[in-house]
UniProtKB/Swiss-Prot annotation:
Residues the entry annotates as binding Ca(2+): D43, D44, C79, D308, H309
Cofactor binding note from Swiss-Prot or TrEMBL: Binds 1 Ca(2+) ion per subunit.
Cellular component aspect of the GO annotation: cell surface; endoplasmic reticulum; Golgi stack
Signal peptide interval: 1-27
Entry-linked InterPro entries: Alkaline_phosphatase_core_sf, Sulfatase_CS, Sulfatase_N
Family: Belongs to the sulfatase family.
Glycan-modified residues: N103, N162, N189, N344, N468, N500, N540, N566, N610, N620
Active site: C79 (nucleophile)
Cofactor: Ca(2+)
Name of the featured protein: Putative extracellular sulfatase Sulf-1 homolog
GO molecular function terms attached to this record: glycosaminoglycan binding; heparan sulfate 6-sulfotransferase activity; metal ion binding; N-acetylglucosamine-6-sulfatase activity
Entry EC no(s): 3.1.6.-
Species: Caenorhabditis elegans
Compartment(s): Endoplasmic reticulum; Golgi apparatus, Golgi stack; Cell surface
Organismal lineage: Eukaryota, Metazoa, Ecdysozoa, Nematoda, Chromadorea
Length: 709
């Protein structure tokens, strides 16, 4: 009996060991399979304006030897909120860093979210972690965030010279000497030093490194050896460049006019400087991968390259900046390479900054925390491989993401907002309102381009004063008779809107120091505005200041502009309530290429407090659109299949049922938590047969169509 009991006990022990040993072996195998992981993050780098075309080394290393995600997006086009998303894997409404000020390294961030960053998770998984470069905009350098073994972060925002860093707990100050102070090179040098030292001393331990470059963020100081490059480069002039004003878009763009020659010169020079700063990043990437090759670590290292958001330079008349829910601000470079990642391949599926944290943890063999909202990119790679082999066991990839900026209050029902907006922007209503103005009811006097008249059907119609139009207008085209009246109404309303904005001083760009006298000069010509611009092509009507330039030679205009004026808009006056404005002067840039003094200075308002929105960005085999709701109750919809530059707000062409479904999906994504966000990131409704075609024909509500070529 005792013998049988012993045998039974031995059997139990053997059975328990049998259960335990595979677990331990699996665990060891999991740790042994951990790879090094590097995240390379740039600051304000676009993809829409062509910046990657000027980084050949990075393109070869990351694109040709890795995978490009052509639909790489950020879920918010603002620095600190986007970076907080990258570090946590959370949407903005879950980490509550809504702006570059509010909670950017604030109390909630430090007490809650910073303690659950990818650095903490990777460190706990046995990685040696390092962070170098820009952290968050309001980081004051007084502490080292949890999770980082090696820490070299700039205090506050990006700079290239004259900055302070927290280097492993010690504050370091840097000057203006290129060889030892240039921040981009310093980030590269210290990153290489970290890798080299780590591999030589701790080769058995995987490392995780975030390299956060300042380029091409302002003040856009290029390294001296690159300051001569890219003269006359204008790749930033996309289809939406200087397409303004836009009465069918949100409040700010309704009040942003076309750029004049000085503004255009500014965007050209700023684009050039941005590309120049990226050359140091390009060299740094090459040096980084050369070192990994020398240390025999390429086979064992994953790398991700992306930016915190995009940028605009003249798009829709906006001189510079981010913050907008358009492709140029939300779409970013997005590349990945490493073991098992296909080479020289492009994926079109939507990926975002919310996916970076889950991806880095997946590489480390760490299960994704339930709180994270994104998904590992390795799952997408596996899914593509499975599809290629006709295996569909994995969950399908998303086709929709949330784009958000700021806190959204409770709004009225979408149907009520839509009807109100549709009524406001209806052509007939707008035509009636405009034609009631006395100046359009008078007979065709010299210089007048349009006349309104009332028909027997009690409707306003417009009459073109043909004797006052130039026969030399190259922009005028022969049109079909059936479309003649409707096209004339389009042209008239566009012209009237632009004139109304200019007469009302509502243009939020280009206020020069001598704006007082420019305004007086314009006042003398307002009654004759038609004389100044008889050839009124809707896409070529200029900013009001441009009208003065048309009457003055360039030499005289520059001389006139430099002369001090009474009542001028001084730099300290460059502000408007609820607006974010800046003054550009010749002293703004300290390094070549410099702003020509003869072009003077100007004020520009690039953002406003009511530019708060939540959007759906959807892209799949049948649909490709952006749907947005603004805090002002404004609604917009852009169909990329027919309008890739987002020139037309086509919301009035949507069926009300589709609109309500889009609004419902947006509402659910706005409040999603944890893994719910992935559930609401699939547009199931768009697969309904009756909703395959999102649009219906309501031509009278398509307010501003671009000229057909």
């Amino acid at each position: 009996m005792i013998s049988n009991l012993r045998i039974s006990n031995y059997f139990i022990i053997f059975y328990v060991l049998f259960l335990i040993i595979p677990i331990k072996v699996t665990s060891i195998h999991f740790v042994d399979s951990q790879h090094n992981v590097i995240l390379i993050l740039t600051d304000d780098q676009d993809i829409e304006l062509g910046s990657m075309d000027f980084m050949p080394k990075t393109s070869q290393i990351m694109k040709e030897r890795g995978t490009e995600f052509t639909s790489g997006y950020v879920t918010t086009p603002i620095c600190c909120p986007s970076r907080s998303t990258i570090l946590t894997g959370l949407y903005v409404h879950n980490h509550h860093v809504h702006t570059n000020n509010q909670n950017c390294t604030g109390v909630e961030w430090r007490k809650v979210h910073e303690k659950k960053s990818i650095g903490v998770y990777l460190q706990e998984a046995g990685y040696r972690t390092a962070y170098l470069g820009k952290y968050l905009n309001e980081y004051d350098g007084s502490y080292i965030p949890p999770g980082w073994d090696e820490w070299h972060a700039i205090v506050k925002n990006s700079k290239f010279y004259n900055y302070t860093m927290n280097s492993n707990g010690e504050r370091e100050k840097f000057g203006s000497e290129y060889e030892k102070d240039y921040f981009t090179d310093l980030v590269t040098n210290r990153s290489l030093k970290f890798i080299d030292k780590h591999i030589k001393i701790r080769a058995w331990q995987p490392f995780a490194l975030i390299i956060s470059y300042p380029a091409p963020h302002g003040p856009e100081d290029p390294a001296p050896q690159f300051a001569h490059m890219f003269e006359n480069e204008i790749s930033h002039r996309t289809g939406s460049w200087n397409f303004a004003p836009n009465p069918d878009k949100q409040w700010l763009l309704q009040r942003t006019g076309k750029m004049n020659d000085v503004h255009i010169s500014f965007t050209d020079l700023l684009h050039r400087r941005r590309l120049q700063t990226l050359q140091s990043v390009d060299e740094g990437i090459e040096r980084l991968f050369n070192l990994l090759r020398e240390l025999n670590q390429l086979w064992n290292t994953y790398a991700i390259y992306t930016s915190d958001h995009g940028y605009h330079l003249g798009q829709f008349g906006l001189l510079k900046g981010k913050n907008m829910p358009y492709e140029f601000d939300i779409r970013v470079p997005f590349f990945m390479r490493g073991p098992g990642i296909p080479r020289n391949v492009t994926f079109n599926e939507i990926v975002t900054n919310v996916d970076i944290a889950p991806t880095m943890l997946h590489i480390a063999g760490v299960p994704k925390p339930a709180r994270m909202n994104g998904r590992s990119l390795l799952e997408l790679v596996a899914l593509k491989k499975k599809k290629k082999k006709h295996m569909t066991a994995l969950k399908p990839w998303r086709d929709t993401i949330l784009i958000e900026r700021g806190k959204m209050p409770k709004l009225k029902k979408i149907r009520d907002r839509y009807i109100k907006q549709k009524k406001k922007f209806n052509k007939e209503n707008r035509l009636s309102k405009e034609c009631k103005r006395r100046k359009w009811q008078r007979d065709c006097v010299h210089g007048q381009l349009w006349k309104c008249y009332y028909t027997v059907e009690d409707r306003w119609r417009i009459y073109k004063c043909r004797d006052n139009w130039s026969d030399q207008c190259s922009c005028r085209k022969k049109r079909e008779i059936s479309n003649y009246d409707d096209d004339d109404i389009d042209e008239f309303l566009t012209y009237a809107d632009r004139e109304n904005f200019s007469e009302g001083h509502e243009w939020y760009q280009g206020e020069f120091e001598d704006s007082g006298e420019v305004g007086e000069e314009l006042d003398g010509h307002r009654s004759k505005r038609g004389i100044l611009s008889k050839c009124s092509c809707s896409r070529n009507v200029s900013h009001p200041i441009k009208l003065l330039e048309q009457k003055m030679s360039k030499k005289h205009y520059l001389k006139y502009k430099k002369k001090p004026q009474n009542g001028s808009l001084k730099p300290k006056d460059c502000s408007l309530p609820q607006m974010n404005c800046f003054t550009h002067t010749a002293s703004h840039w300290k390094t070549p290429p410099l702003w020509p003094e003869e072009l003077g200075e100007f004020c520009f308002c690039q953002n406003c407090n009511n530019n708060t929105y939540w959007c759906l960005r959807t892209k799949n085999e049948t649909h490709n659109f952006l749907y947005c709701e603004f805090v002002t109750e404004f609604i917009s919809f852009y169909d990329f299949n027919t309008d890739p530059d987002q020139l037309i707000n086509a919301v009035y062409s949507l069926d009300i049922g589709v609109l309500e479904q889009l609004s419902e999906q947006l509402r659910n994504l706005r409040k999603c938590k944890n893994r719910q966000c992935e559930i609401w990131s699939t547009s199931q409704m768009l697969r309904s047969p009756k909703l395959v075609d999102l649009r219906v024909n309501e031509k009278s509500f398509l307010t501003y169509q671009p000229e057909k070529t």
